[in-house]
């Protein structure tokens, strides 16, 4: 659902930020 997609997007953003 929307919440799941939103959570995935947030997690991806966090991962990319940490791996930057």
Curated annotation (Swiss-Prot):
Its main location: cytoplasm. It comes from Mesocricetus auratus (Golden hamster). It comes from the Eukaryota. Binds two metal ions per subunit. Two metal binding sites with different affinities are located in the enzyme active site and can be occupied in vitro by different metals: site 1 is occupied by Zn(2+), Mn(2+), Mg(2+) or Co(2+), while the tight binding site 2 can be occupied by only Zn(2+) or Co(2+). One Zn(2+) ion is tightly bound to site 2 and essential for enzyme activity in vivo, while site 1 can be occupied by different metals to give different enzymatic activities. Mn(2+) is required for Cys-Gly hydrolysis activity. GO terms for molecular function: aminopeptidase activity; carboxypeptidase activity; metal ion binding. Signal peptide: none annotated. Coiled coil: none annotated. The keyword Lyase does not apply. One of its GO terms (biological process) is proteolysis. The gene is LAP3. Its EC number is 3.4.11.1, 3.4.13.23, 3.4.11.5. It is found in: Cytoplasm. Its cofactor is Zn(2+); Mn(2+). Keywords: Aminopeptidase, Cytoplasm, Hydrolase, Magnesium, Manganese, Metal-binding, Phosphoprotein, Protease, Zinc. It catalyses: Release of an N-terminal amino acid, Xaa-|-Yaa-, in which Xaa is preferably Leu, but may be other amino acids including Pro although not Arg or Lys, and Yaa may be Pro. Amino acid amides and methyl esters are also readily hydrolyzed, but rates on arylamides are exceedingly low; an S-substituted L-cysteinylglycine + H2O = an S-substituted L-cysteine + glycine; L-cysteinylglycine + H2O = L-cysteine + glycine; S-benzyl-L-cysteinylglycine + H2O = S-benzyl-L-cysteine + glycine. Belongs to the peptidase M17 family. Homohexamer. The modification Phosphoserine is found at residue 6. This is Cytosol aminopeptidase. It is an enzyme of class 3 (hydrolase). Disulfide bonds: none annotated. Cytosolic metallopeptidase that catalyzes the removal of unsubstituted N-terminal hydrophobic amino acids from various peptides. The presence of Zn(2+) ions is essential for the peptidase activity, and the association with other cofactors can modulate the substrate spectificity of the enzyme. For instance, in the presence of Mn(2+), it displays a specific Cys-Gly hydrolyzing activity of Cys-Gly-S-conjugates. Involved in the metabolism of glutathione and in the degradation of glutathione S-conjugates, which may play a role in the control of the cell redox status. GO terms for cellular component: cytoplasm. The keyword DNA-binding does not apply.
């Amino acid at each position: 659902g929307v919440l799941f997609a939103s959570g995935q997007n947030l997690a991806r953003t966090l991962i990319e930020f940490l791996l930057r």
